[in-house]
Each structure stands twice: as C-alpha cells, then as structure tokens.
From Swiss-Prot:
Belongs to the AdoMet synthetase 2 family. Pfam families: AdoMet_Synthase (PF01941). This is Uncharacterized protein SPy_0538/M5005_Spy0445. The gene is metK1. InterPro entries: AdoMet_synthase_2, AdoMet_synthase_2_family, AdoMet_synthase_3. It comes from Streptococcus pyogenes serotype M1.
C-alpha cells in the first residue's frame, strides 16, 4: 500500500467564495439513490437470513420516469402514473433456492417512498418494472450453487473495479447550512431516519448556498402540496412563515454570520417533480456527505445500490468517510482522503492512499486509525448494512 500523509490541506472555507447545492430527499435523483440503497439493504438482509451469505448483485441502476399530473390549487390526480424501472444485475437464486427479487425490489421501493413522500399513493400512482438481469460470462456468478461460487467468502475479498474514492471532514459552514436548511423540514422516525415534519410541504426541496467572502446568499425552492392550498395568498403566507423560522434557526446556530434568503415555491401533487414528468437516476444527485460542493474534489462513483461485500465504490466510500471523520476527531484538524484501488487487488489494501490534513499530525497514530479500519475486513459489510450509511439523510431539525 502506497500511503502518504501530508499537511497543508485547506478546505473551501479558506477560499473567498463557495457554492454548495443540496438536492432534497424528495428530489428525483435523491429518490433514485434512496430506493437503490433500500433495495440493496433489504436484498442483502434477506439473503443473509435465508442463506447466510450475500450473493452477487448490484442495484445501482434505477430510473424514475415522472408521471403526469396537472398542478392546480386544491389538488389534482395523475393522468399518467409514475414509473420506476429496476435495472442492474442480481442473483435470482442461491444454493438452488429462488430469491423473490421483484417482490423485494417493489417492497423496498414502496417502503422508501412512503417515508419520504407520505402524500404519494404508491399503490395507485406508481408502476414498477424490473429489468434486472443475471447475464454474465462467469459460471454460476449470479446463481451460486455452493460457497465456492462466492470466492469473497473463501478468501480475502478482491476489488471489483479500478476506482477512486474521496472523502473529507468536517463540513464548512456553507455545507452545513445547505443540509440544516433542508433538515429543518424533517424529524427522525422510530428507526432514526428522516421523515417530514410538515404535512403541507413536499420533499423536493432545493437549497443553494453561495458564500462571497463573509456574505452567505441562500436560495430555497419549496414544493407545496397543492391540495392544501386554495390560492397564491395562502401559499405565500405559509412559505413566509417557514422562511422566518428558518432565519431564526440559522441565527440560533450561527451567531455571527451575515446571510440573506431568497426563495421560490411551486405546486406539486405529492411533493416531488416526479409528479410532472421529471426523471431521476442513481448517481446524478448529491455526492459525498449528501451535498454537491463545487470546490471539493469528488468521484463519479455512486455508492447507492452497490454490493456491500466487494464493490470498491461502496466499501471504500464507507471507509473513506469513516477514516476522515476519525482523523479529524483525533486531531481537530480538517482532513481529506483520496483512495485508489485496482481491480483484482485485495479490497482492504488500497493501491494508493493519500491523507491530507491542515495541521501536522502524529503519523503513527494516523496509521493506527487506518489499519484498525482496514483490519475490520469483512465486518465493514455488516457495518454498512447496520448503520444504513448510504441511505440518504439530512441534518434534521434540532431547534
């Protein structure tokens, strides 16, 4: 492993300007990420329970085709339903027993949509189709008959791809603002996952934060549920009320920053632009830590729906996040990690690992942190599943 630890790293807070975007939990692309990851979790847990292993699969290819509903005050029904198409590849049987793949996919997607978009009548207005295949040139790869057909369980897992993963910690104020403003509209449910606080507000909230020197310009797009409003005056009063509360929330969290808020609201049937034709796809939305931070390096790897046993873009996305946070907590200095791994290499021995911190740190202690997480080995798969690390989240309201 080529490991380099250097100091002199500066995060975007040192620049004279920043641009940070947050696509809310109800945004079509964020919905696609969430559905893909929910399927991956439910499929993996089903197979672990039934077979004791996770067979080969990847669900990181999902498309949402928006429906057709005409927006008007007082609400409206769908003329054409929303359609969700499951792609990717997966084992449809394991050890000669069938796996109810489409049932798992549909149930997981329905569960996810019900939490994020409670105003969406999934049963009547969403169609599901699975095009998930088991095509491959490898014998028994997607239909393992014995443990020998799952080499990652017999040996040290090998990387499935040549890829780069990037993470960093902590977030800048601009990045935190993007998450906490959307998070104002959410609370935690009994499973510690975000769920809407307000019945009349949808989930397709867009937040853009632009910092110019010490001035923060914030733009918020609010999706209103049309059936709860009779006219523009009601809508304006409702949004104005929340904007004032958001301002107070920001002032409570950040005592000495100068900011302004501009906003726009629009009508939806269920709370998302998938109501009127917009498409969603895995990997087109938020990046590391749930934001699109324009002055951060990032990778095109999309972890949502990827196999949590040996996919570089999943396992090392988790490890990069975890290690970056722990290094920051250990030394109280900003940290950035860039990891590169080659296909066929040992999964827990990256080809290159570059760790950058702002201040000098004890390199032996950093190495101890890295090795401890690497030595967790296959236990990282269980951690990814149990923590639901890649299920889209936000900084829920705690005011």
């Amino acid at each position: 492993m080529d490991l380099k630890i250097t100091n002199g790293f500066y995060d975007p807070s040192h620049l004279s300007y920043e641009v940070v975007e947050r696509k809310g939990l109800g945004h079509p692309d964020t919905l696609a990420d969430g559905i893909a990851e929910q399927i991956e979790i439910d499929y993996s847990l089903y197979c672990l329970d039934k077979f004791g292993v996770i067979p080969h699969h990847n669900f990181d290819k999902i498309i949402i085709r928006g429906g057709h509903s005409v927006q008007d005050f007082g609400g409206s029904d769908f003329i054409e339903p929303i359609k969700i198409i499951f792609l990717g590849r997966a084992s449809k049987k394991c050890f000669n027993s069938s796996i109810p793949l489409f049932k798992i996919q549909k149930k997981a997607a329905t569960k996810y949509l019900n939490r994020i978009l409670p105003n969406l009548d999934v049963e009547n207005y969403v169609e599901f189709e699975t095009l998930t295949s088991d095509f491959t040139t490898k014998t028994n790869w997607f239909s393992p008959e014995a443990i020998e057909d799952l080499p990652e369980y017999l040996d040290v897992p090998k990387a499935n791809d040549t890829a780069t993963m990037i993470s960093y910690w902590p977030l800048t104020i601009s990045e935190e603002l993007a998450l906490m403003i959307e998070g104002y509209f959410y609370k935690l449910d009994k499973n510690e996952l975000p769920t809407p606080r307000f019945t009349k507000m949808g989930g397709d909230i867009k937040v853009m934060v632009v910092r110019n020197d010490l001035e923060y310009s914030i733009r918020i797009n609010f999706p209103l549920i049309s059936k709860f409003f009779n006219n523009d005056i009601e809508s304006q009063l409702y949004v104005d009320k929340h904007v004032e509360k958001i301002k107070k929330y920001i002032e409570q969290k950040y005592k000495n920053i100068s900011f302004s808020i501009d906003y726009h609201y629009y009508l939806t049937t269920t709370g998302s632009c998938i109501d009127f034709g917009e498409e969603g796809a895995v990997g087109r939305g938020n990046k590391t830590h749930g934001i699109i931070s324009s002055f951060r390096p990032n990778t095109m790897e999309a972890p949502a729906g990827k196999n949590c046993t040996y996919f570089v873009g999943k396992v090392w996305g988790f490890l990069s996040d975890t290690i970056a946070k722990e290094i920051y907590e250990a030394f109280n200095t900003p940290c950035q990690i860039i990891m590169q791994l080659n296909i066929g290499s040992k999964l827990y021995r990256p080809t290159h690992l570059f760790i950058q911190t702002e201040e000098s740190v004890d390199q032996e202690r950093v190495l101890e942190i890295v090795n401890r997480h690497l030595n967790n080995g296959k236990q990282n798969t269980n951690l990814i599943l149990s923590t639901q690390h890649f299920i889209p989240k936000t900084n829920v309201y705690d005011g």
